[in-house]
Protein backbone atom coordinates (compact mmCIF):
# COMPACT_ATOMS: atom_id res chain seq x y z
CA UNK A 1 0.00 0.00 0.00
CA UNK A 2 1.17 3.51 -0.76
CA UNK A 3 2.42 5.45 2.24
CA UNK A 4 2.77 9.01 3.48
CA UNK A 5 5.36 10.95 1.46
CA UNK A 6 4.95 8.92 -1.73
CA UNK A 7 3.62 10.38 -4.96
CA UNK A 8 0.06 9.33 -5.77
CA UNK A 9 0.25 7.39 -9.06
CA UNK A 10 -0.99 8.72 -12.38
CA UNK A 11 -4.62 7.83 -12.92
CA UNK A 12 -7.51 8.48 -15.27
CA UNK A 13 -10.97 7.48 -14.02
CA UNK A 14 -14.46 8.45 -15.14
CA UNK A 15 -16.84 10.08 -12.72
CA UNK A 16 -20.56 9.35 -12.56
CA UNK A 17 -21.18 11.66 -15.54
CA UNK A 18 -18.53 10.14 -17.81
CA UNK A 19 -16.07 13.01 -17.25
CA UNK A 20 -12.42 12.04 -16.86
CA UNK A 21 -10.72 12.84 -13.56
CA UNK A 22 -6.92 12.65 -13.60
CA UNK A 23 -3.86 13.76 -11.66
CA UNK A 24 -4.10 17.07 -13.52
CA UNK A 25 -7.69 17.54 -12.34
CA UNK A 26 -6.68 17.37 -8.69
CA UNK A 27 -3.45 19.36 -9.03
CA UNK A 28 -3.39 22.66 -7.20
CA UNK A 29 -5.55 21.81 -4.21
CA UNK A 30 -5.48 19.26 -1.45
CA UNK A 31 -7.56 16.20 -2.25
CA UNK A 32 -9.19 13.43 -0.26
CA UNK A 33 -9.60 10.26 -2.30
CA UNK A 34 -11.45 7.62 -0.35
CA UNK A 35 -11.79 4.03 -1.53
CA UNK A 36 -14.84 2.08 -0.46
CA UNK A 37 -16.24 -1.36 -1.28
CA UNK A 38 -19.68 -0.73 -2.78
CA UNK A 39 -22.48 1.79 -3.28
CA UNK A 40 -25.68 1.43 -1.25
CA UNK A 41 -24.27 -0.72 1.53
CA UNK A 42 -24.80 0.50 5.12
CA UNK A 43 -21.24 1.51 6.05
CA UNK A 44 -20.42 2.90 2.61
CA UNK A 45 -23.60 4.97 2.71
CA UNK A 46 -22.75 6.35 6.16
CA UNK A 47 -19.26 7.25 4.95
CA UNK A 48 -20.54 9.01 1.81
CA UNK A 49 -23.17 10.93 3.78
CA UNK A 50 -20.53 12.05 6.30
CA UNK A 51 -18.48 13.51 3.44
CA UNK A 52 -21.64 15.11 2.01
CA UNK A 53 -22.49 16.71 5.34
CA UNK A 54 -18.96 18.06 5.82
CA UNK A 55 -18.14 19.06 2.23
CA UNK A 56 -18.58 22.79 2.85
CA UNK A 57 -16.04 22.64 5.68
CA UNK A 58 -13.52 20.80 3.46
CA UNK A 59 -14.12 23.20 0.57
CA UNK A 60 -13.34 26.04 2.99
CA UNK A 61 -9.92 24.44 3.47
CA UNK A 62 -9.49 24.19 -0.34
CA UNK A 63 -9.87 20.40 -0.15
CA UNK A 64 -11.71 18.45 -2.84
CA UNK A 65 -13.21 15.00 -2.26
CA UNK A 66 -13.59 11.98 -4.52
CA UNK A 67 -14.94 8.54 -3.68
CA UNK A 68 -13.72 5.49 -5.62
CA UNK A 69 -15.25 2.03 -5.93
CA UNK A 70 -15.67 -0.69 -8.51
CA UNK A 71 -19.27 0.32 -9.18
CA UNK A 72 -20.51 1.44 -12.61
CA UNK A 73 -21.37 5.01 -13.61
CA UNK A 74 -25.07 4.11 -13.43
CA UNK A 75 -24.75 2.72 -9.89
CA UNK A 76 -22.84 5.86 -8.87
CA UNK A 77 -25.54 8.07 -10.42
CA UNK A 78 -28.25 6.22 -8.50
CA UNK A 79 -26.26 6.37 -5.23
CA UNK A 80 -25.66 10.10 -5.65
CA UNK A 81 -29.32 10.78 -6.43
CA UNK A 82 -30.63 8.62 -3.59
CA UNK A 83 -28.48 10.32 -0.92
CA UNK A 84 -28.08 13.77 -2.52
CA UNK A 85 -24.29 13.44 -2.60
CA UNK A 86 -22.48 16.63 -3.58
CA UNK A 87 -19.12 15.30 -4.79
CA UNK A 88 -17.90 13.00 -7.56
CA UNK A 89 -17.69 9.23 -7.36
CA UNK A 90 -15.10 7.64 -9.63
CA UNK A 91 -15.43 4.35 -11.49
CA UNK A 92 -12.66 1.77 -11.00
CA UNK A 93 -14.56 -1.22 -12.44
CA UNK A 94 -11.41 -3.15 -13.33
CA UNK A 95 -9.79 -2.13 -10.01
CA UNK A 96 -6.71 -0.91 -11.90
CA UNK A 97 -6.08 2.07 -9.60
CA UNK A 98 -7.17 0.15 -6.49
CA UNK A 99 -4.64 -2.57 -7.29
CA UNK A 100 -1.88 -0.07 -8.13
CA UNK A 101 -2.14 1.63 -4.75
CA UNK A 102 -2.65 -1.56 -2.77
CA UNK A 103 -6.25 -1.24 -1.53
CA UNK A 104 -7.59 -4.19 -3.55
CA UNK A 105 -6.93 -7.06 -1.16
CA UNK A 106 -8.15 -10.39 0.15
CA UNK A 107 -10.93 -9.65 2.63
CA UNK A 108 -12.79 -11.82 5.12
CA UNK A 109 -16.45 -11.20 5.79
CA UNK A 110 -18.77 -13.51 7.69
CA UNK A 111 -16.25 -16.33 7.35
CA UNK A 112 -15.91 -15.96 3.58
CA UNK A 113 -12.84 -14.76 1.72
CA UNK A 114 -13.02 -12.60 -1.39
CA UNK A 115 -11.02 -9.96 -3.20
CA UNK A 116 -12.22 -6.39 -2.93
CA UNK A 117 -11.47 -2.83 -1.93
CA UNK A 118 -10.38 -2.34 1.68
CA UNK A 119 -11.79 0.95 3.00
CA UNK A 120 -8.87 3.38 2.82
CA UNK A 121 -8.55 7.17 2.59
CA UNK A 122 -5.67 9.09 1.00
CA UNK A 123 -5.01 12.76 1.69
CA UNK A 124 -2.97 14.27 -1.14
CA UNK A 125 -1.27 17.67 -1.30
CA UNK A 126 -1.38 20.23 -4.11
CA UNK A 127 1.55 18.54 -5.89
CA UNK A 128 0.18 14.99 -5.74
CA UNK A 129 2.21 13.81 -2.75
CA UNK A 130 0.42 11.76 -0.10
CA UNK A 131 0.11 13.77 3.13
CA UNK A 132 -1.37 10.85 5.04
CA UNK A 133 -3.20 7.54 4.65
CA UNK A 134 -6.01 6.28 6.85
CA UNK A 135 -6.01 2.50 6.64
CA UNK A 136 -8.82 0.31 7.97
CA UNK A 137 -11.01 3.39 8.18
CA UNK A 138 -13.34 3.71 11.15
CA UNK A 139 -16.23 5.57 9.55
CA UNK A 140 -17.55 6.95 12.86
CA UNK A 141 -14.32 8.85 13.56
CA UNK A 142 -12.97 9.48 10.06
CA UNK A 143 -14.13 13.10 9.66
CA UNK A 144 -12.58 14.01 13.03
CA UNK A 145 -9.34 12.28 12.02
CA UNK A 146 -9.28 14.12 8.68
CA UNK A 147 -9.79 17.44 10.47
CA UNK A 148 -6.76 16.71 12.66
CA UNK A 149 -4.63 15.78 9.62
CA UNK A 150 -5.68 18.85 7.64
CA UNK A 151 -5.19 21.11 10.67
Residue ranges and their predicted role:
Residues 1-151:
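Chalcogenol-based redox active-site neighborhoods
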Amino acid sequence: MLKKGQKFPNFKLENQNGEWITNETIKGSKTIIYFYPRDNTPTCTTEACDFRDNLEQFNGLNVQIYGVSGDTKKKHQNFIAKYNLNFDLLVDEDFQLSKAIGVYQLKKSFGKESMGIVRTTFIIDEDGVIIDVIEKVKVKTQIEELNQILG
